[in-house]
Amino acid sequence: MPLDGVKNIVLVLSGKGGVGKSSVTLQLALALTLQGKSVGILDIDLTGPSIPRLVGLEDAKITQAPGGWVPVTVHPASTNDGAQRGSLRCMSLGFLLRDRGDAVIWRGPKKTAMIRQFLSDVYWGETDYLLVDTPPGTSDEHIALAEQLLRPATTNPAAGSSTMPRLAGAVLVTTPQAVATSDVRKEVNFCVKTQIPMLGVIENMSGYTCPCCGEVTNLFSSGGGQVMAQETGVKFLGAVPVDIQFGELVEGKVVDESDDESEDGAQPEQKREQKQDEVVDERPLVERYKDCWSYSRFEGFADTLLSEIEGGVAY
């Protein structure tokens, strides 16, 4: 089966949209690869896939192999200066769309069938961690995912081993404000009812750090995620302020050609010349990510998750 080589599956959940699940998924994946782990990202947000854009591979296409669909490689495994870096690959419906602007207008049964196909027809090979980026709420995608991953593991008589990977648990993502935490509480309830272990809560967008003076401004208040975690008995992994550098990294500083003139009166030709003069950083995404200050936060999250998962601790 395509999931045979996957050792652990981690779900990234939130009851609220727009809290940054996809960016958290990507940063956790990058941090884990820098720990030497081979990582895959499965994007099951079928109507709004974000992973292809975040990894800068919107034009990549899925190839078919005898073992199933082959995920898109973000970067291969390598060893630099004695440090082992694991591989990162991803799979998303965004890679299968004929045009990236096409809307996905599917009813529940078709979504369920697509989730099942992702879990049965994608060949991941040897993968330490498969992170699943989910849509907000507790809808068809979540139910289909839980049904597939929570089935009793079957045993292959020839190999004498389980053919299903371990569902290590879920990471819950929220922003500090009450309108977000109230919906994430419902996600906690979903995990309890489906018996999905909860690895912890990450409070995303917890303030904004000025790049000039370092002053932190609480744009969306602060501490709401920690309070929710304490009240629901789930481990609080930590808070992450807004990181402008990471935003620029995944956006690629795209020039908006629709702007005829900038505020200072520069013409489009001048802006294109300025763009051509910029030095293009050809390093892989994972190496450029190490320059973002949020990397240290997610490195800590990755350490905590590795100790919980490989040490057998979950809530």
Swiss-Prot record:
Residues 269-282 have a biased composition (Basic and acidic residues). Coiled coil: none annotated. GO terms for cellular component: cytosolic [4Fe-4S] assembly scaffold complex. InterPro entries: Mrp/NBP35_ATP-bd, NUBP2/Cfd1_eukaryotes, P-loop_NTPase, YlxH/NBP35. Residues 253-282 are annotated as: Disordered. It comes from the Eukaryota. GO terms for molecular function: 4 iron, 4 sulfur cluster binding; ATP binding; ATP hydrolysis activity; ATP-dependent FeS chaperone activity; metal ion binding. Residues 257-266 have a biased composition (Acidic residues). Its cofactor is [4Fe-4S] cluster. Keywords: 4Fe-4S, ATP-binding, Cytoplasm, Iron, Iron-sulfur, Metal-binding, Nucleotide-binding. Binds 4 [4Fe-4S] clusters per heterotetramer. Contains two stable clusters in the N-termini of nbp35 and two labile, bridging clusters between subunits of the nbp35-cfd1 heterotetramer. GO terms for biological process: iron-sulfur cluster assembly; tRNA wobble uridine modification. Pfam families: ParA. It is found in: Cytoplasm. ATP binds at G15, K16, G17, G18, V19, G20, K21, S22. Signal peptide: none annotated. [4Fe-4S] cluster binds at C210, C213. Heterotetramer of 2 nbp35 and 2 cfd1 chains. Component of the cytosolic iron-sulfur (Fe/S) protein assembly (CIA) machinery. Required for maturation of extramitochondrial Fe-S proteins. The nbp35-cfd1 heterotetramer forms a Fe-S scaffold complex, mediating the de novo assembly of an Fe-S cluster and its transfer to target apoproteins. Belongs to the Mrp/NBP35 ATP-binding proteins family. NUBP2/CFD1 subfamily. This is Cytosolic Fe-S cluster assembly factor cfd1. It comes from Aspergillus oryzae (strain ATCC 42149 / RIB 40). The lineage of its organism: Eukaryota, Fungi, Dikarya, Ascomycota, Pezizomycotina.
